[in-house]
């Protein structure tokens, strides 16, 4: 027989179920700790530990003066392939983070993306991705993206200087790099993006990341590595993103490949 869960866990599970079924809606406050103690739900320490567990699981936010409140919004959709649709940024002005907001039915302002641009020495990972010696000069465009006042993620793109020198990509003005963003800048410079490789993994955040992204205690981040190439294989961007784990739902919609069919087509040519 499995051991009985501690009382704080039982209390946390009960509130979690009530949140999921809508008994407590987004923005609604859970009972005060002292009220639950008086109602016989456990000691102050028990109730506080239950609420901290709910916060760690991303269901509530705890703050002085506001108590324990159910998180207001569902995670943002982070589109996989669709966010890079050329028609969005080449022919329009829907850069990747805006495409995510549109898909999520959420509002946005261009200045919710801020950035700093600097010329730095390439780390081993950056140098390998861009095909440069370690320590070579590269441009780093570091962005912090927010939804309203809440940070959602950081994204730092690295470029060879000869690809972006004198372009809007090295302009630190808040918001995307002009109409269509960085991919449109590369397109106009003769570096049309053709294919990408993305790698994602979850990890524990650093103390600095937890503070910058305003993470709940125990919340993990999802790190993204994106390598962007032209049709001839030239790497024109290597990017590292750090996303608040509970603020995104990663969404992919793609045609299922059939390598046997592709090989047959190649042989018939």
From Swiss-Prot:
Where on the tree of life does the source sit, at the highest rank? Bacteria
| Family matches, as Gene3D superfamilies | Chorismate lyase-like, Winged helix-like DNA-binding domain superfamily/Winged helix DNA-binding domain
The protein's matches in InterPro entries, at most eight in alphabetical order, are given as:
Bact_HTH_transcr_reg, Chorismate_lyase_/UTRA_dom_sf, Tscrpt_reg_HTH_GntR, UTRA, WH-like_DNA-bd_sf, WH_DNA-bd_sf
Q: Which residues form the HTH gntR-type domain?
A: 5-73
The record's annotation in SMART domains points to:
HTH_GNTR, UTRA
Per the UniProt entry, the signal peptide is none
Gene Ontology molecular function terms on file: DNA binding; DNA-binding transcription factor activity
Q: Which UniProt keywords apply?
A: DNA-binding, Transcription, Transcription regulation
Q: What does this protein do?
A: The imp locus inhibits the extrachromosomal maintenance of the Streptomyces plasmid SLP1.
Q: Which organism is it from?
A: Streptomyces coelicolor (strain ATCC BAA-471 / A3(2) / M145)
Q: Does the keyword Aminoacyl-tRNA synthetase apply?
A: no
The answer on whether this UniProt entry bears the keyword Oxidoreductase reads no
Q: Biological process (GO) annotations?
A: negative regulation of DNA-templated transcription
Protein name as it appears in the record: Uncharacterized HTH-type transcriptional regulator SCO4628
Kindly indicate which segments of the sequence are annotated as binding DNA.
33-52
